[in-house]
Amino acid sequence: MDSNNTEFKDNYQHIPDDIPLTNIKLPNEWVLYLYDKQLFKKMANRPNFQAKPHKALCTISTVNDLLYIMELMKVNNDPKIKSVETDGKINLDANDYIIMRKGIEPIWEDPRNSNGGTFTVKMDHSKGYDVWKIFIQYILGETLTSEISDMKSINGITVSYISDSYNFQNPASKNTLGNTLGNSLGNSLGNGLGNSFTYIKIWDGKPDRTRDQFVSMLPATIIDKIKSDSLMYSQNSKKKHFNEKNIIGKLNSGRKPSNTRGGFSSFGNKRY
């Protein structure tokens, strides 16, 4: 059993060692999407431009599926080595990805997303994969929070790699958790691999949640990982381009993107 399998089983002690991971169903099914945010911006800004910026790649329904995706997403954290060749992988250096509950469209306007918001963590890219991996284990295992009603409103997770410096537009919302708790941990932005960052966004369907309310329900393991990073919570209904006229029609037009970021053109046809 590899380290990923061991780590996962450590978090789920009730899984007998003699049961193959391929036979263990996740509590619910999820869909992995390749996301092209530049295409979305074009669609939002051009009245007659129709496209679908998110492309469904596969369904994640078993523990084995989850472990396989985590393995494919691995990145090289050595600051002297930049991963540019993906070898068919879907690692976090190459593209932006969304994992969403099956049956929910990965857009703000979906009825199960529209009244909620997104909790965003901005961190140095060198630790982005590790934090993302922990988040998806909790989310897809339905254990991010002990409250069932809160867990049911966690609809998905987006991960993005940003290679240039970018700051949240709401300074009051980007304080680190360490500062919020009165610690002297400071803000870690800019202290890592150049200006390379990982953004992780959690899709939350619950209305009127605040950043601190969301943080308070997270496991201690995650809080410890992100307490010195930049955190923000934003309501979907207040975002630019929310409920743009004909946005649903544009998304459902069936028009394919003209190009794909990264070296990931054939994975969409792969089954497992």
UniProtKB/Swiss-Prot annotation:
SUPFAM superfamilies: eIF4e-like (SSF55418). Recognizes and binds the 7-methylguanosine-containing mRNA cap during an early step in the initiation of protein synthesis and facilitates ribosome binding by inducing the unwinding of the mRNAs secondary structures. This is Eukaryotic translation initiation factor 4E homolog. The keyword Protein biosynthesis applies. Residues 255-272 have a biased composition (Polar residues). It holds the Pfam family IF4E. Keywords: Initiation factor, Protein biosynthesis, RNA-binding, Translation regulation. Residues 249-272 are annotated as: Disordered. InterPro entries: TIF_eIF4e-like, TIF_eIF_4E. One of its GO terms (molecular function) is RNA 7-methylguanosine cap binding. GO terms for biological process: regulation of translation.
